[in-house]
């Protein structure tokens, strides 16, 4: 097993996740099987109870793990399926060590950071790195390890020490370190002092960088590269220029041009890893597909505007998987994507009384969009604005996709304005004692624990069965006319089964349900160009080269190409089945 560690210095949020994902993707083009581990040095057990406005989105895995958003980057770039154990947190590793101490596993010894915690980290890495993550079912060849935060922070100290020991445990030819640093441009001059200081700190902790990836707003000058190489004690070929590009999907090709993979191939002796001809051909095809995808991205002239109506729009990372899924779909449709960010509460009449400009600006964005997306969320703030957005899309014939909460608000809007129940709502927003039974469109799932928040939702990969007589459905056609699909869930509330008949009698058809036939998973409005809602989160399984089908449908419908896309899907997947 080969290990490539990606660490960061100077500041956090510097792009370690994209660089780690891009490095892994390039290693896959050699035919290697690649896995990833993310280390998050916070005390939380997982990201499940963290505010999206503080930490960005919570990414959900097949096994129901609620993890850091970077695991989504790994899955999207590498086309792999990770588990909750691929995300190591301080809280998780401390809990593991403490539970072992309570069992008496340490035989009465004084349990310390070194060696007990650091050994636990190393053991965890070695165990998880061997878990198969792709459709081959084989053990990976390379593990990318991203160390979150900034080297030198007190929170990451135990992990840095564990990695220092780990490099000797696995051997130099099996361990490489890429350090990501910032090269700011001040008054037109590229400054290297922050990088020099970061590398000095890194070396003082016992970690020697094999490559220094320099993040900069512009391409590095040759003199800057030479200066960093000289003062950081590396060769110029070990300094990688990672300047700003139009799209992060260009980063792998940017690294490829600078011979990063050639260096890692030599440094880690990757030529000794046994590969079949099929492995090499698959890797070569991956590179070709990626190059074609970026070319389509560059050559696209037509713009598609999607209004994202949410409640966490102040921090775009709150909807990272959603925006990435829209990007994947737009590239597939050969369109330039323009996301119109609409804060849901700004669509509500109360905002007009307080700030008319904000109100009118938000409605102008919504009304000018080619398609409307209402993503998931929790709580009551902005709900009426989301309902108004769903109403606008339904009445105006604008393509609409509602995800999780988005499905629920679309159902509430339909019950209010089509069925004629103006008091319809969800028991999440109003106590069930305040709602008449017929007005409870969305209810709390009976099996969910109301007392404990962490890990108590309906989580992870679950089947959705397309219902009889749903062959007309666009969303079913987008999935290739299959009878069932498997998608990831994260919710506590569901459509009330008691209102389904009334909804369906008016054309609001629940075309997909769970295996019991009771829980509603997908709806589609008959007679509308594209008005779809999913209780699951299709954004969690979207890949760069294989977009999520509901998102693909939204962008295609917004671009006027839905019929062509459905035809192409059925042709290609029909040929594969033959």
From Swiss-Prot:
Q: In which pathway does it act?
A: Pyrimidine metabolism; CTP biosynthesis via de novo pathway; CTP from UDP: step 2/2
Q: Where is the active site?
A: 404, 537, 539
The UniProt pH dependence field says: Optimum pH is 7.5.
Could you tell me which InterPro entries the record lists for this protein?
Class_I_gatase-like (IPR029062), CTP_synthase (IPR004468), CTP_synthase_N (IPR017456), GATASE (IPR017926), GATase1_CTP_Synthase (IPR033828), P-loop_NTPase (IPR027417)
Functionally, this protein is described as follows:
Catalyzes the ATP-dependent amination of UTP to CTP with either L-glutamine or ammonia as the source of nitrogen. Plays an important role in the regulation of phospholipid synthesis.
Record organism:
Saccharomyces cerevisiae (strain ATCC 204508 / S288c) (Baker's yeast)
* Primary enzyme class: ligase
Q: Which reaction does it catalyse?
A: UTP + L-glutamine + ATP + H2O = CTP + L-glutamate + ADP + phosphate + 2 H(+)
In its UniProt record, which GO terms are filed under biological process? 'de novo' CTP biosynthetic process; CTP biosynthetic process; pyrimidine nucleobase biosynthetic process
For this UniProt entry, the molecular function terms from Gene Ontology, in alphabetical order, are: ATP binding; CTP synthase activity; identical protein binding
Cofactor(s) required, per the database record? Mg(2+)
Q: Where are the transmembrane segments?
A: none
Instruction: Indicate where this protein resides in the cell.
Output: Cytoplasm
Domain Glutamine amidotransferase type-1: start-end pairs: 305-564
Instruction: Show the Pfam families listed in the entry.
Output: CTP_synth_N, GATase
Give the family per the record.
Belongs to the CTP synthase family.
Presence of the UniProt keyword ATP-binding in the record: yes
Q: Which GO terms describe its cellular component?
A: cytoophidium; cytoplasm; fungal-type vacuole
Its gene name is URA8
Q: What is this protein called?
A: CTP synthase 2
Q: What is its EC number?
A: 6.3.4.2
> Any miscellaneous information on file?
Present with 5370 molecules/cell in log phase SD medium.
